[in-house]
Amino acid sequence: TVGNGLFVTGKGEESHQINPSQTEEGVVYGQAVHRQEFGIYKGTFWSPKGSYLAFYRMDQSMVTDYPQVNTSTRIATLEPDKYPMAGMTSHKVTVGVYDVKTGKVIYLQAGDPTDRYFTNVSWSPDEQHIYVIELNRDQNHAQLVCYQAATGEREGVLYEEKNPKYVEPQHPLVFLPWDESKFIYQSQRDGFNHLYLMDTKAKGEGTWKNGKLE
């Protein structure tokens, strides 16, 4: 990323800008979103074979500025930061997919992103699907949603988790090398941090680890 833009460079090639070249005020591409919560520490996600690049697009033009002090300069200066205070309008996130071969970009058809968190982006081993754990702003209802990578079409919900207090997804899916239809899902749904063996072909909670151990 350069500034708020996202670029891709191949070996011996010039860099290609993925986002629109014109300036979009308050829009950031390819960087961590949602204040780096829910295990989010980056904003780009390469597919297993490098054919596609999924990325976050964060529109924070509707978020108010919060004054921060830059202490890295010799004389401290004020630098505004987009920070939504409790109950105020938060930024809106969408997930894009860049096709390396065609240079085209599509966006996952997730619906209105208002007051939603899009976390733990994962690729299927065959690069055909993208999985996103989506969370409401109240943080008490999470859904594991499957999308078509080539079109962005929403295929459906594989699993959902509710809790009257909160749900906090922290880890992307881990697919089994010997069975690409199976994956490991990490959750605290029973009060402890456990691993669950789940199947892309069957909706359900999965089973694996039980008991009062983490």
Feature map (PLM): residue ranges:
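Beta-strand C-termini and the immediately following turn/loop, strongest in propeller blades
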Residues: T1-G5, G10, K42-F45, A54-Q60, ...
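A conserved hydrophobic secondary-structure block that centers on an alpha-helix together
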Residues: T1-Q17, S21-E25, P113, T119
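Hydrophobic beta-strand positions in blades of beta-propellers and related beta-sheet-rich domains
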Residues: L6, S15, L53, V95-V97, ...
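Short loop/turn segments that connect beta-strands within beta-propeller blades
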Residues: G10-E13, D99-G103, A149-G152, D199-K203
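Beta-propeller fold detector
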Residues: E14-T23, I106-Q109, R154-E160, E205-G211
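Predominantly five- to eight-bladed beta-propeller fold
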Residues: I18-F45, F55-Y107
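Short glycine-/Asp-/Thr-/Trp-enriched loop segments that recur within the blades
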Residues: E24-I40, P113-F118, N163-H171, E214
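Signature of short aromatic-glycine-proline-rich micro-motifs recurring in repeat-based ectodomains
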Residues: Q31-P48, T94, N120-S122, P169-S181
